[in-house]
Amino acid sequence: MVLLHWCLLWLLFPLSSRTQKLPTRDEELFQMQIRDKAFFHDSSVIPDGAEISSYLFRDTPKRYFFVVEEDNTPLSVTVTPCDAPLEWKLSLQELPEDRSGEGSGDLEPLEQQKQQIINEEGTELFSYKGNDVEYFISSSSPSGLYQLDLLSTEKDTHFKVYATTTPESDQPYPELPYDPRVDVTSLGRTTVTLAWKPSPTASLLKQPIQYCVVINKEHNFKSLCAVEAKLSADDAFMMAPKPGLDFSPFDFAHFGFPSDNSGKERSFQAKPSPKLGRHVYSRPKVDIQKICIGNKNIFTVSDLKPDTQYYFDVFVVNINSNMSTAYVGTFARTKEEAKQKTVELKDGKITDVFVKRKGAKFLRFAPVSSHQKVTFFIHSCLDAVQIQVRRDGKLLLSQNVEGIQQFQLRGKPKAKYLVRLKGNKKGASMLKILATTRPTKQSFPSLPEDTRIKAFDKLRTCSSATVAWLGTQERNKFCIYKKEVDDNYNEDQKKREQNQCLGPDIRKKSEKVLCKYFHSQNLQKAVTTETIKGLQPGKSYLLDVYVIGHGGHSVKYQSKVVKTRKFC
C-alpha cells in the first residue's frame, strides 16, 4: 500500500522520478514526509500498517485514500468508532491509464487529475453503519485507488483507522480466545469477581499484553477508544489529533472541513475562543472506571453499591502496538444490603441508638392503647441525623435533627410507626429517642436555641473566670464542671468531648464547680452568670454546663475553653 499523493506525483513527473522512495513504516521518515503540505493538500492518506486517529464533525464527511499497486494483494481495513456510531464505505477506483509514465505529450495539471480521480464513483466493496469495530478483509485485492468515506450523523466524534497489506504478519490487534466471554464468578453486596480466558497473543505469539477492566452503570463498551472518549469527555478541540502525527497539517488547519466551503458555511476559526469551546463542549459528569491490571485474568471489583446494576468490560492491549481488542462484556446486579434489624420502642422509655457513618437504623413503635397523638423526643448526641417517620407506610415526617427536638404527630387507632434514622457522611451518630402517647410526661429537659457558653474576657483574673449561659421558662437544674487542659488544646480534641449525651455522672467529683436551679418566664432575662474561682494563673480550662430534666436525663451545653491571666 502506498500513499495517494506519491501516486499522483507520478502523473506529473517524468519516468526517472519513479526512483523516489515511497513512504514506509519508518516512523521518522514518515513524519518527515507528512510535514510537506504540497504532498498532502486537501486530502488524507492512510499509511500501511499504522493506526491513525482522527476526528469527525457531525454531518461533515471525511475521505481517505490509499493505493494498492499490484493485483492479488492481501488487504485488511479496520475502522473503530469511539464515542458515536459511524457510517463508512470502502470503494475501489482504477488508476488513470497514463500512471505508468509511458505516454507522450503534455500531462494535465495535477489538481485537474486529482479531481478526475476523486469525482469518479468507483466500485463499492464494503459499507457499514453502527458503533462496532468492523473489518474489511480480502486475501486477494486488485490494484487500484481505494477510497474510504466516513460520516457521523449523531454528533462530533473521534475514530481510528488501520489498514495493512500484510495482515498475516502484522497482527497488531491482540487475539481473543475461542470463548471471549467475561464471566462473573462471585457476587456480593459491594464486590464482583470477574474471570476470562487468556489471550493467545501472550501464550502463543509471546507478545506482551495487559488487560484493562472497565466498570460503569450505563452500558457495555465495544472498544477501548470509546471508553477513553467517555473518560476524557472534554473540549473536543483539545482532544483532536495533532498535525504531523495523525493527519496532514492542512487537515489540522481546516479540521476536517472541505476546502471549498470551510470558511463560508461554518465560519470556523483555527483557534476557537475558550468561551465558545466551553459552551459547545461542557465537561459531563463521568461515572466510569478503568483499571489496567497487567496480565492477570481474574479480578475483583470492590467498593460497589448494593443492589445496583453494573456493566463490566475487559480489553486486552498489545503493549508494543498499544492497540486493543474487546472481550464480550457482561453485567451483574450486586446483592441487596442485609435487612436491618428493627428495634422495638416502648412507650415512655428512652432507647439509645448508634448509627454507623452513612448507615441507617430502623425502629418500630406500636402503642398498646388507642391514642390521639404520638410524641417523639430525639436527642442527637453528636452531629445531625436524619429522621423519617411513617405511619402504616405513609410518610409523616422527614427532616434533620440536631441537639434535642420533639415532634408531635396525629395518632390513629391500632397504628404502627416505623422510624428510620440515617447517619451523615462525617462520622458515626449517637442519639437517644423516646416515643410516647403521653406527651405531658417530659423526660428531656427543654433547651434554649443557643446552647453556647459565653466567657467575659474583661472579668478574667489570675484565679477566676466569669461565664454566662441561657436558660428557659422551665425550671431545670444546671451543673457546671471544669477541667484543666493543655494550652494547645485544639478543635479536634474539643469535638471528641462534644457528646451531649454523656452526663455529669462520668465526671470526677473534683471537676464539679456547683449545681443550681434556674428559670425565667421572660426569655429575654433567662440568662445566668457564674464565676469559677480557685483557678491557677496562666492555665487553660475546659468548662461544661449540664442541664438535668425532671426525668433525670441530662444534656450538655457546648464546651468552652477559658484561660486565666498570667500576670495580675
Swiss-Prot record:
Location(s), subcellular: Secreted
Recorded disease: Hypogonadotropic hypogonadism 25 with anosmia: A form of hypogonadotropic hypogonadism, a group of disorders characterized by absent or incomplete sexual maturation by the age of 18 years, in conjunction with low levels of circulating gonadotropins and testosterone, and no other abnormalities of the hypothalamic-pituitary axis. In some cases, it is associated with non-reproductive phenotypes, such as anosmia, cleft palate, and sensorineural hearing loss. Anosmia or hyposmia is related to the absence or hypoplasia of the olfactory bulbs and tracts.
Predominant subcellular localization, coarse grouping: secreted
Regulation: induction: Up-regulated by hypoxia (at protein level).
Domain of life: Eukaryota
Listed Gene3D superfamilies: Immunoglobulins (2.60.40.10)
Glycosylated residues (UniProt): 322
Signal peptide interval: 1-19
The protein's name: Protein NDNF
Chain's gene name: NDNF
Alphabetic keyword roster: Disease variant, Glycoprotein, Hypogonadotropic hypogonadism, Kallmann syndrome, Neurogenesis, Repeat, Secreted, Signal
GO biological process: angiogenesis; cellular response to fibroblast growth factor stimulus; cellular response to hypoxia; extracellular matrix organization; gonadotrophin-releasing hormone neuronal migration to the hypothalamus; negative regulation of endothelial cell apoptotic process; negative regulation of neuron apoptotic process; neuron migration
PTM annotation, UniProt: O-glycosylated; contains heparan sulfate and chondroitin sulfate. N-glycosylated.
GO cellular component: extracellular matrix; extracellular region; extracellular space
Function: Secretory protein that plays a role in various cellular processes. Acts as a chemorepellent acting on gonadotropin-releasing hormone (GnRH) expressing neurons regulating their migration to the hypothalamus. Also promotes neuron migration, growth and survival as well as neurite outgrowth and is involved in the development of the olfactory system. May also act through the regulation of growth factors activity and downstream signaling. Also regulates extracellular matrix assembly and cell adhesiveness.
